[in-house]
Amino acid sequence: MQRLQICVYIYLFVLIVAGPVDLSENSEQKENVEKEGLCNACMWRQNTKSSRIEAIKIQILSKLRLETAPNISRDAVRQLLPRAPPLRELIDQYDVQRDDSSDGSLEDDDYHATTETVIAMPAETDLLMQVEGKPKCCFFKFSSKIQYNKVVKAQLWIYLRPVKTPTTVFVQILRLIKPMKDGTRYTGIRSLKLDMNPGTGIWQSIDVKTVLQNWLKQPESNLGIEIKALDENGHDLAVTFPGPGEDGLNPFLEVKVTDTPKRSRRDFGLDCDEHSTESRCCRYPLTVDFEAFGWDWIIAPKRYKANYCSGECEFVFLQKYPHTHLVHQANPRGSAGPCCTPTKMSPINMLYFNGKEQIIYGKIPAMVVDRCGCS
């Protein structure tokens, strides 16, 4: 009996010394720890997102081989942007990005952008010859994107002013050459006859692929072209030097070059949203807004979904390189842990002005994070 009393006294003494146990306080502490962990995760993701946006700006300039962003204002874009069918079609039916989960990442050219279409505007140059005392339109400069790729199509687009009565228009495209002994200064490229009805003006395209290929082989022969579009009364309807109200009606070249993307294998990863509590490596949504940067030189897309990777990479979750796990087990202090990085990326299509005020349409590789993993 005495032994039982002694045990009871000891138990009461322990309760008095330890004090009352507040279960609600422990619960609050646990909740605070969890909230603090979530806040830290949110801050980490926000920092990762900001770093990703800055990296994207640097990558775009680098992949387009631009030292700085072209200094083109919105007003200049409106003036320079042709109001022509091929360009309107690109903008209206613009495919911002391809996100086909059944395909692997595109790895064409590994780094630099691959051009599909180039819109070349007339350039100002001293090389343009004077014919009959007047400068003749037009002279075109060609970037390396055209020079070092196979040209599959080249169309010269010209705008014909509207007519008041039905008429037949005779269109002539002449290539300027060095003066011959007989005084000849040009040679014919293409001629055609059009019937025009009263109303609005029209855009007309002319195949100049052969001429362009010759210019690329012999750049010194590129002295420019002359455009004529005479109606039955001898009036020239071709817009070569746009006047008031004719912004965007300049002649231009639409050049298409080859593009042969390669395919690679696919892998898998986690997808999360900004409210996710997932701690593991995961892909999060991120929209890049070019207008917010003041990058008016990018015609389309004005924004795109880039996404980013964030999260922990414990060795038990290692997805891509199992040998790293073995290295860590053999030397846990001497091996760096895996990082949450993109394991699959895809390109975006972009329509933009380069530094020479040429409009270029092409792919920029590895700009969209499709999947994330630990490596």
From Swiss-Prot:
One of its GO terms (molecular function) is heparin binding. It comes from the Eukaryota. Residues 1-18 form the signal peptide. One of its GO terms (biological process) is negative regulation of myoblast proliferation. The record marks R98, D99 as: Cleavage. The keyword Glycoprotein applies. It is found in: Secreted. Pfam families: TGF_beta, TGFb_propeptide. Homodimer; disulfide-linked. Interacts with WFIKKN2, leading to inhibit its activity. Interacts with FSTL3. This is Growth/differentiation factor 8. It comes from Canis lupus familiaris. The gene is MSTN.
